[in-house]
Every structure is written in C-alpha cells, then in structure tokens.
Amino acid sequence: MSRAKATILCIEDHWNGLLARKMFLEKHGYEVLEASGIDEGLKLFLSRNVDAVVLDYQLPGMNGDVVAEKMKRLNSHVPIMLLSAYGPLPGRKLRSVDWFLTKSQPPTDLLSALQDLLDDQHKPFFARWLNQWKNRSQVSS
C-alpha cells in the first residue's frame, strides 16, 4: 500500500509524543488521525477508514493490549502496532497486536515496521504470521 494513501490512527495519552509522532508520520506521507485517549481512539477506529493503528501500551484506564484486543474483535483486518516505554512485554500482552516497538527505538524503525504492516495486509496468513514471529523473537532476545 502506498504511504500517501495510508491512514494511521495514533493513540497516545502524552500530548508531546502524540504530536511528534503525528508530525513525523505526516512528513513521510501518511495521513494521521490522533487520539489522546481510549474512548476517542475507539470512536475514530469505528467511524473512519483506518489502515493501521499505532497504540501506546500504558494508557489511563486500560492498557494498550486490552484496547488492541477490543479493536481486533471489531475489525481483525486492521494491523495494530503497540509502543511501550518499557522493555519487552510478556508474550500474552502481544497476542492481539501485529507488531511491537519500544519508544526508545529510532523513528526509522517505526517507519519500516509500519510499511511492513501495511504490506503484510495483503499477504497470506502464514507469511504474516512468520513476519510477526520473527519480530517478536527479536524483541525478546
């Protein structure tokens, strides 16, 4: 999928992080919808045509893995990337997400992971699963 046509929903409760991520992704050709909380994020997810979600792990009221689980029940075809300021998360926290990055990783990692997620949407299930497995095994190393 072309970046210029991809709409990314970013959910982050820290305004500075949300604004920085939005500006960075827009600079690289993405359309970005931003939400500073869970309710706002879920409303945008349901009402807009979203190609991928970039979701903070630690949100007030509910962790990102639980939000991702709700989103997957609503639309399992939208890839979700979970970001965390904390190191690797246990595998059970990653069940409903398609990619995991720590916030300390360089922004270029976000770009390449996002493009991989968008490209993987059209791949057969096994190819998507293999990419996810490779990514998760690198995170836990």
Can you name each region flagged by the protein language model?
Residues 12:
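Conserved acidic carboxylate
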Residues 15-33:
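Two-component/phosphorelay signaling modules centered on CheY-like receiver
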Residues 34-52:
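Acidic, metal-coordinating helix/loop segments flanking the phosphotransfer/catalytic sites
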Residues 56:
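Active-site residues of response regulator receiver
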Residues 60:
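The feature encodes the CheY-like receiver
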